[in-house]
Amino acid sequence: MLKKLVLLLTVGISTLVTAATPGTYFYGLNYGINPNACPSYEQIKGDFEKIQLYTNRVRTFSMSVCNQGALALQAANELGMNIYLGMWIDTPATFESEMAALTNVMQSGASFDKVDAIIVGSEVLYRKDTDENTLADYIKKVGQLVRPKGIQVTTADVYYEFPPVVVAELDFLMMNAFPYWEGVTVENGATTLIEHFNSAVLGKSLGKPVRISETGWPSSGPNFGASIASPENEKLYLSNALCLTRKNNIDMIYFSAFDEPYKAGVEAHWGIMNPDGTLKTDLSTSLFANPTC
């Protein structure tokens, strides 16, 4: 996640957007797993059924770890959900493992009709896991494998990490932005998100579509500058982010579906749901249906 102090943007607006209906509250939700306690197919399907109460689209992060790609695709297909299949590529060896897993799933005969795209890496340039030319090469190789079947290819990274050599290989861009890690007040969080989208990413997109792949606010944990983690602030940021992205016709995959207690500190508290799949106390479907900003 992004930990960069940048700008404060204060905009005072109050508006109501068109209400969403059950299953369409979010464009999508991010779904992570504990790699040290691999979930079964039944567990993944059960998680997806809970997610489906709020969206019909999910995004995963790895093909090979815990066989997540194959299991998640199977669950999504059975439930009729759309899915972004992620590839984790922190090293060359990991990329080869992810490519092998993706190839195996494609050769298995599984339907890819509900696959929105393959996401080749998550914040790899931000973390300096690889360089821009290597990432562009990875994206090209994945594209050669999946584009003949009509599947799009992209990468997800922080809003300032989209060099031209990478953008040239993408079908569309996916932007991560976490105003919490920028130390802004929650009141300025969602407007900061939209500012990054408009000023930082659209100008680098070469006219290609841009979507938000990760954003959110934690309900617990240490503060970061003026960013305060609390249930009330998670609620406010979520409402503002939903409202502004709908108002601006921006597709946003919210981070995240569930709290992840296997992670340390504040990283464990970004879900809209508790680990057992119950909605957090301060959140509600009425908020999701009618967010304000």
Q: Where in the sequence are the language-model features?
A:
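Aromatic- and acid-rich polysaccharide-binding/catalytic face
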Residues: 116, 122, 157-196, 211, ...
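Active-site clefts of carbohydrate-active enzymes
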Residues: 177-181, 206-234, 258-263, 268
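Substrate-binding cleft of extracellular glycoside hydrolase catalytic domains
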Residues: 32-36, 41, 63, 68-152
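Aromatic-rich peripheral "rim/lid" segments of glycoside hydrolase catalytic domains that contact
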Residues: 223-230, 244-293
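Boundary/entry segment of secreted carbohydrate-active catalytic domains
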Residues: 20-57, 64
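Hydrophobic faces of well-ordered beta-strands that scaffold small-molecule active sites
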Residues: 27-31, 56-60, 83-86, 116-120, ...
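Acidic (Asp/Glu)-rich catalytic clusters
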Residues: 20-23, 47-53, 67-82, 101-114, ...
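Aromatic-lined carbohydrate-recognition surfaces of secreted/lumenal glycan-active proteins
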Residues: 143-163, 208-215, 251-262
